[in-house]
Design a protein with these regions (language model features):
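Domain-terminus/edge residues, biased toward the C-terminal soluble/receptor-binding domains
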Residues: 175-179, 187-327
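Hydrophobic alpha-helical membrane context
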Residues: 36-37, 75, 93, 295
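Active-site-adjacent loops and short helices of periplasmic peptidoglycan-processing enzymes
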Residues: 42-199, 203-208
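Bacterial N-terminal signal peptides
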Residues: 27-37
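Juxtamembrane/membrane-water interface recognition
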Residues: 18-21, 36, 84, 151
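Bacterial N-terminal signal peptides that target proteins for export
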Residues: 5-28
Length: 327
């Protein structure tokens, strides 16, 4: 039976895995692979999307199920906030800051990202003090630009220095082609990311900071007596989604990074270049549902099964069995 994988020859001539570096690689045994679910599904696996760029990955094995120009550099828009949050989570994990650490709202944060800006905001009051925990909720749930800037200034002293930290940290965790210029994702001609890097980043956050990742599934947050719902459209769909974020710029269109679990397996996707927020939600749902149905896990070898014999020269025996390791 000939099996077909969900990617084009121009993108990936053969199935790839996306590594988790520098932390432990969560790859399954080579004896476990994801294959098209049936001969019929082998043809259906030739999926397409209206997105200009797209990437779908199965998390446990790191298998790329679908890719469409995922290394093209695009404007990240609010998806840059994933990198901002990684730095905040890292600072919490290493003890540099605490969840109840208080930061003061500067005039820059208020004017650039707060109520006067007209953008996504948690409506932080000028010169008020806000805890790191509340700022995290503001950024993740409300996509708050003021929350990002307050955190950046509090941790690094200025947003410019924080952006330098973002770039250094991005390299440390395995991002290859992305450049950050601010904590919010507000337009900057030099600020670019790839979907490959965004999925790598999302995957890293999910595995390294499970206690903070849960905030991405929070449905709403109220600050300054203003109630706002989570902006991630995937949370409203019945597909098992529990994160991550969205973004929009005129040049890159509507984009999204989403993470969802189905039948005990996690899938992470990124889309960009969509025409409307409605189309973004529709295409995101479509690619997740396709991934759930088009592939199945296949155990090629049983645990402890002899796969082959290896010749031994000068030993007691002429050969030794090669067996599938215990899982």
């Amino acid at each position: 039976m000939r099996l077909s994988y969900a990617m084009t020859e121009t993108d990936f001539p053969r199935q790839r895995t996306l590594p988790l570096q520098p932390f432990r690689k969560l790859a399954a045994s080579l004896a476990v692979v994801l294959l098209a679910a049936s001969p019929v599904h082998a043809q259906e696996a030739l999926f397409d999307t209206k997105a200009k760029q797209a990437l779908m990955l199965e998390d446990q094995t790191g298998t790329i199920l679908y890719a469409k120009t995922p290394d093209t550099l695009i404007e990240p828009a609010a998806l840059a906030k994933l990198m901002t949050m990684e730095l905040v989570f890292h600072a919490l994990k290493t003890g540099q800051i605490k969840i109840d650490t208080q930061y003061t709202v500067s005039e820059n944060a208020w004017r650039t990202g707060g109520a006067p800006s007209g953008g996504s905001t948690m409506f932080a009051k000028l010169k008020s003090s806000i805890s790191v925990g509340d700022l995290i909720q503001g950024v993740i749930v409300q996509s708050a630009n003021d929350g990002c800037i307050i955190l950046a200034e509090g941790i690094a002293g200025s947003e410019q220095k924080f952006a330098e930290m973002m770039n250094a940290r991005a390299k440390e965790i395995g991002l290859k082609n992305s450049t950050f210029r601010n904590s919010t994702g507000l337009p900057d001609p030099e600020q670019k990311v790839s979907l490959t890097d965004l999925v790598t980043l999302a995957r890293y956050i999910k595995h390294e900071y499970p206690e903070y990742y849960r905030t991405y599934a929070q449905e709403s947050f109220t600050w300054n007596n203003i109630f706002q719902r989570n902006r991630n459209p995937l949370l409203k769909l019945d597909i098992g989604a529990d994160g991550m974020g969205t973004g929009y710029t005129e040049q890159s269109g509507y984009g999204l990074v989403g993470s969802a679990e189905h039948n005990g397996r996690r899938y992470i996707a990124a889309l960009s270049g969509l025409a409307t927020d409605k189309e973004r939600a529709e295409e995101a749902k479509k690619i997740f549902e396709w991934a759930y149905s088009a592939f199945e896990e296949v155990n090629i070898f049983a645990e402890g099964e002899t796969i082959a014999e290896a010749s031994v020269f000068g030993g007691v025996k002429s050969s030794v069995p090669l067996k599938e390791h215990e899982r």
